[in-house]
Every structure is written in C-alpha cells, then in structure tokens.
Amino acid sequence: MIAVIIAGGSGTRLWPLSTSTQPKQLLALTGERTMVQQAYDRARKLGDTIYVVTEASHAGALRAQLPELPDEAFLIEPGRRGTAHCIVLALDYINRHHDQTEPIAFIHSDHNVRDAQGFAHSFDTAARVSRECGCITLIGIEPTFPSTGFGYIQRDGVIDVQAGVYNVESFKEKPDYETAKQYVESGNYLWNCGYFVGSVDVFRNEMQRSAPDLWSNYQTLASIADFGSEAYNHAYLALDNQVIDIALIEKAHQLAMVSASFDWMDIGNFKDLHDA
C-alpha cells in the first residue's frame, strides 16, 4: 500500500500557537515529535512508499522535519487548490510511477492517533475491501460523544460484520448538539475523519462516473509531460478550489466504510488540544 500524507492545512484555529507560516502539523503538540512526524511514523506501518503533498511555502520545513524521505517524495502544490486537487495531483504522480491497481491510503498530517497498530489494521482492512469491491473505502470513527465539530457518515447495511465493514448511506454536515446526540444514540453514524483508500484505477473510475469536472482536471494535468514543470504548475494554478468530500466522495456511486479500530482526534481547537 502507498501512503499519501496530506500536509497543506494552515491550522489557524489554533492561533497564535499555530499560524499560516508555522501550521500545527509542524508543531510538537502531543509529544516529542511533531504532528507530521507522527503521521509519518504511522504511514510507515502501511508500507514502504510514502508521499507528502504540501503547498510550496511549507515544503522546506517539511523536508527538514522528514529527512528520511527523498526529495521526490514531496509532491508540491504551487498554490492551494483544495483537498480535491491535491489528491488529484498525487494520483497523477502515482499513476506515472506505480502500478495503477495498488491501494493508496490518504491520511492527514495533523491528527492525533495513539494506537499505530490499530491504525494499520484498519487501513489494511480498507485496502482489502477496496480491492474486492472496486470502490473508494472510507475509515469512520465510532463517536464517543455528540460532537458538533465533525461531519458524520451514516452506515447502511453490513458488508463484513466481523471486520466492521459497512455500506455508506449518507453524509451529514456538522450538526447542532441535539442532532449530534440523536446520531450517537442511534448507533448508525460514525465521525468522518477524512481518511480513505483506493487505487488510481478506483479513483479514476469514480471521477469519470461521479465527478466529470474533477475528471477533466485530472486529464488536464495528466496530459502534461513533465510533472511539476512550469506548464504543469500554470495549469494547476488555473484550477478552482474544491474540497474532496463535496467534489467526489459524497457524489460517489459506491462506497464502503471500515469502522476504525484506533483512537482518533482532530486537534482543531484548544479544547481538542487539552483533551489530547
């Protein structure tokens, strides 16, 4: 499995601790290693091939924090164009250099996860499910309280009860407290942590079916011979800003979801940091 660490966020909700020039993924908030270094440690449990997608202004700091990775492992956005296009950029690069059928795990650089073994187990399950169903497979977090700060995924129907694998019924935006309480009490909703697994082929097929605009943007980048060239960067900067959940995931014709077997926290504010 290939791991792609998404490391382009600004983390301004933790200002002044985290700033646009020194975002939270570059800080040691929950231990001796920084958030992105901890994400790298977890990514190593998934496989030997690891990429980091980031915006140009953070590339130098990330290279300094992850000296184990070669220069070509850093996939640089010339400017932020949203999570949808940073993932498209990664898919294009991986398609040029790897097997199109190899599963890819997209993970975030600023989440707090203590159970690295459980993390790896969940992603191994997601990779297996994605291969079997030919679909993008999400990781969902069983909610421990009625959070109003996270989106929710409604599960519908069991694919593999022993492995905790489900079909996806719907997505819910961040709810008010009473709605969140209903979600948790129903037992049918998981937190959407933004983790997903699928091969280049799986993502390309789903873009063609469900997100023609995103597919067109992928084709534009893939048609340029030199990845990262001036022409490539010019084309990338001409793209609009899109979030992957809205641009593709919520439109997908078929999805599966694995219930995570690890603890998780998105440190989005000072209360989350205190709880972590």
Where are these regions (language model features)?
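Catalytic core of tubulin tyrosine ligase-like
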Residues: 152-276
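Short coil/turn connectors at secondary-structure junctions
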Residues: 1, 47-48, 70-71, 100-102, ...
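Short, well-ordered, mixed-charge alpha-helical segments that flank or form enzyme active sites
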Residues: 112-116, 145-150, 179-180, 204-205
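Active-site glycine-centered loops adjacent to acidic/histidine catalytic or metal-binding residues
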Residues: 9, 110, 269
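Basic phosphate/pyrophosphate-binding loop/patch that engages nucleotide-derived ligands
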Residues: 116-162
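Conserved N-terminal catalytic core of the sugar/cofactor nucleotidyltransferase
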Residues: 1-5, 13-17, 23, 28-108, ...
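A short acidic, often aromatic-flanked loop/helix-cap motif at beta-alpha or helix-coil junctions
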Residues: 80-84, 145-147, 177-179, 264-265
